[in-house]
Protein backbone atom coordinates (compact mmCIF):
# COMPACT_ATOMS: atom_id res chain seq x y z
CA UNK A 1 0.00 0.00 0.00
CA UNK A 2 1.25 3.48 -0.82
CA UNK A 3 2.10 6.22 1.64
CA UNK A 4 -0.45 9.01 1.88
CA UNK A 5 -0.64 12.54 3.19
CA UNK A 6 -3.38 13.70 5.57
CA UNK A 7 -4.27 16.56 7.85
CA UNK A 8 -5.00 16.24 11.54
CA UNK A 9 -8.53 17.19 12.54
CA UNK A 10 -8.26 16.54 16.29
CA UNK A 11 -6.40 14.68 19.00
CA UNK A 12 -8.71 12.68 21.27
CA UNK A 13 -8.47 10.77 24.54
CA UNK A 14 -5.30 12.48 25.81
CA UNK A 15 -3.35 11.67 22.66
CA UNK A 16 -4.41 8.03 22.41
CA UNK A 17 -6.56 8.62 19.32
CA UNK A 18 -6.14 10.77 16.21
CA UNK A 19 -8.96 11.90 13.94
CA UNK A 20 -7.85 12.89 10.45
CA UNK A 21 -9.36 15.21 7.86
CA UNK A 22 -10.99 12.26 6.06
CA UNK A 23 -12.74 11.45 9.41
CA UNK A 24 -10.75 8.24 9.86
CA UNK A 25 -9.66 7.46 13.42
CA UNK A 26 -6.37 5.94 14.49
CA UNK A 27 -5.43 4.39 17.83
CA UNK A 28 -1.94 5.51 18.81
CA UNK A 29 0.56 2.86 19.93
CA UNK A 30 1.36 2.40 23.63
CA UNK A 31 3.80 5.02 24.85
CA UNK A 32 3.34 7.31 21.84
CA UNK A 33 0.42 9.32 23.25
CA UNK A 34 2.91 11.54 25.10
CA UNK A 35 4.02 12.69 21.65
CA UNK A 36 0.64 13.02 19.93
CA UNK A 37 -1.03 14.89 22.80
CA UNK A 38 1.05 17.92 21.70
CA UNK A 39 0.00 17.74 18.04
CA UNK A 40 -2.26 20.49 16.70
CA UNK A 41 -5.26 20.47 14.35
CA UNK A 42 -4.25 21.09 10.72
CA UNK A 43 -0.79 19.54 11.25
CA UNK A 44 0.31 17.79 8.05
CA UNK A 45 0.80 14.04 8.47
CA UNK A 46 2.37 11.29 6.39
CA UNK A 47 0.87 7.82 6.78
CA UNK A 48 3.11 4.86 5.96
CA UNK A 49 0.92 1.76 5.83
CA UNK A 50 2.59 -1.38 7.15
CA UNK A 51 -0.32 -3.80 6.64
CA UNK A 52 -3.51 -5.01 8.34
CA UNK A 53 -4.58 -1.48 9.30
CA UNK A 54 -1.27 -0.66 10.98
CA UNK A 55 0.84 2.35 10.04
CA UNK A 56 3.56 4.76 11.01
CA UNK A 57 2.20 8.31 11.20
CA UNK A 58 4.71 11.15 10.90
CA UNK A 59 3.89 14.74 11.83
CA UNK A 60 5.55 16.85 9.14
CA UNK A 61 5.00 20.13 11.00
CA UNK A 62 7.11 19.49 14.10
CA UNK A 63 10.71 20.73 14.34
CA UNK A 64 12.00 17.16 14.17
CA UNK A 65 9.31 15.05 12.47
CA UNK A 66 7.56 13.00 15.16
CA UNK A 67 6.81 9.41 14.10
CA UNK A 68 4.34 7.20 15.98
CA UNK A 69 2.80 3.77 15.58
CA UNK A 70 -0.96 3.62 15.00
CA UNK A 71 -3.80 1.30 14.02
CA UNK A 72 -6.81 2.38 11.99
CA UNK A 73 -9.98 1.87 14.02
CA UNK A 74 -12.56 3.73 11.91
CA UNK A 75 -12.92 4.90 8.32
Predicted feature locations:
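Short, Lys/Arg- and Gly-enriched loop/turn segments at beta-strand edges
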Residues: 52-60
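Structural detector for short beta-strands of small beta-barrel domains
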Residues: 1-14
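Short peripheral tails and domain-boundary helices/loops at the edges of structured domains
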Residues: 60-75
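Short, basic/aromatic beta-hairpin or loop at an interaction surface
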Residues: 11-26
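A short, sequence-level motif marking secondary-structure junctions
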Residues: 30-35, 71-75
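Short coil-to-beta-strand transition motifs
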Residues: 1-4, 38-41, 64
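Short nucleic-acid-contacting surface segments enriched for D/E, G, S/T with interspersed K/R
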Residues: 31-48
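Short, surface-exposed beta-strand-loop junctions and turns on beta-sheet-rich folds
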Residues: 24-27, 34, 63-65
